[in-house]
């Protein structure tokens, strides 16, 4: 074979092994379908839309619920220095008088336990405290002489109570809020129950409260607050501890930052709340959150020192003066540390 023939043969062999010509058959490849991805994206988008609608709907409902809270005209309140925030403000919080059965007739009578509390937030936005005033302590009620504190409400209105406490303490009160304990069961159920501590076993309405920690649902929370075997002042402590337990759980479990739980919790709160007419919707929500934060700190809950003269409960003037100064100077926690006997016990009788 000549060299020329060999080269031509090799060239033909190389051509046959080379790339396919334009006329050669190319294997068919099925295009991958994008339909599953499209369906997934549409589904995800729909879910996101539903979530957004649900969140917007939740906040709209919450705003409506807060707007529906009764507003009360209360004279004697002082406009806050920083109205855009709740820092450096003092709130007067009361409850309807609650007797052993909680009937309307009992709510119009004196002598039953009722909550009178000054809730103060520090000006720096860090901390504060709650000061409970016994409703049966005798003080000067303007226009009525020396009377039990709660009579200021019974004989007048929230305005007279504000005037009485301002005269007693020298503390400017910025806002007023009133709780209705007849609706406490709904709130306790909405947050999934609470825990309270009882120092000794008791029995009320046929329900046994064991010594130590008790898990309360809505109904048993009412039993706890109205136990007829507990005297009035101790029943007041139970109500305060129940309020503290409720708002502690709301804060610790972040129930007001979760859109799912927020609606149910705020709905329950608004059903038992009335506030002064200067309260804005954001003020109310902020108050609930701030109260919850402080509720977890037992050192910031104190009871006004009193003493007994004859058969009457009267202020302990010397200690009380220090407490009023502590409120004005944002130092309730320091007062409680100096005077531990004034700290409200979490284990109410």
Residue positions per predicted region:
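Terminal targeting segments of Actinobacterial cell-envelope proteins
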Residues: 1-41
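Entry/capping segment at the start of metal-dependent catalytic domains
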Residues: 28-125
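C-terminal solvent-exposed extensions
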Residues: 69-74, 79, 86, 99-100, ...
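Extracytoplasmic
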Residues: 86-89, 111-116, 125-128, 133, ...
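Second-shell loop/turn segments in exported
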Residues: 102-107, 147-155, 170-175, 226-234, ...
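Sec-exported extracytoplasmic/periplasmic mature domains
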Residues: 123, 138, 142, 154, ...
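Amphipathic, coiled-coil-like alpha-helical scaffolding segments used for oligomerization/assembly
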Residues: 150-210
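Flexible, polar/acidic helix-loop-strand segments at domain edges
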Residues: 186-268, 273, 348
């Amino acid at each position: 074979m000549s060299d020329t023939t060999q080269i031509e043969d090799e060239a033909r062999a190389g051509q046959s092994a080379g790339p396919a010509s334009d006329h050669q058959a190319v294997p068919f490849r099925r295009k991958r379908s994008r339909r599953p991805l499209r369906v997934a994206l549409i589904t995800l988008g729909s879910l996101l839309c539903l979530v957004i609608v649900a969140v917007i709907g939740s906040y709209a409902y919450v705003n409506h619920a807060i707007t529906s809270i009764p507003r009360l005209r209360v004279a004697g309140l002082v406009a806050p220095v920083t109205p855009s925030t709740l820092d450096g403000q003092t709130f007067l919080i009361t409850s309807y008088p609650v007797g052993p059965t909680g009937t309307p007739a009992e709510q119009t009578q004196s002598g039953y336990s009722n909550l009178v509390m000054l809730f103060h937030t520090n000006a720096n936005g860090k901390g504060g405290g709650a000061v409970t005033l016994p409703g049966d302590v005798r003080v000067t009620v303007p226009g009525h002489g020396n009377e039990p504190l709660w009579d200021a409400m019974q004989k007048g209105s929230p305005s007279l109570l504000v005037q009485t406490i301002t005269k007693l303490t020298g503390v400017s009160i910025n806002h007023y809020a009133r709780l209705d304990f007849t609706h406490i069961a709904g709130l306790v159920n909405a947050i999934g129950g609470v825990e309270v501590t009882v120092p000794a076993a008791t029995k009320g309405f046929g329900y046994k409260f064991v010594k130590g920690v008790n898990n309360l649902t809505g109904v048993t929370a009412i039993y706890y607050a109205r136990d007829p075997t507990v005297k009035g002042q101790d029943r007041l402590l139970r109500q305060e501890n129940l309020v503290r337990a409720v708002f502690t759980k709301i804060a610790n479990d972040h129930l007001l930052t979760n859109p799912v739980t927020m609606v149910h919790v705020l709905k329950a709160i608004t059903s038992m709340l009335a506030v002064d007419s200067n309260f804005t919707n954001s003020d109310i929500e902020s108050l609930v959150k701030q109260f919850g934060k402080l509720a977890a700190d037992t050192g910031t809950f104190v009871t006004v020192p009193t003493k007994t003269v004859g058969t009457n409960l009267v202020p302990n003037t010397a200690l009380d003066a220090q407490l009023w100064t502590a409120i004005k100077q944002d130092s309730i926690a320091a007062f409680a540390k100096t005077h531990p006997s004034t700290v409200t016990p979490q284990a109410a009788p």
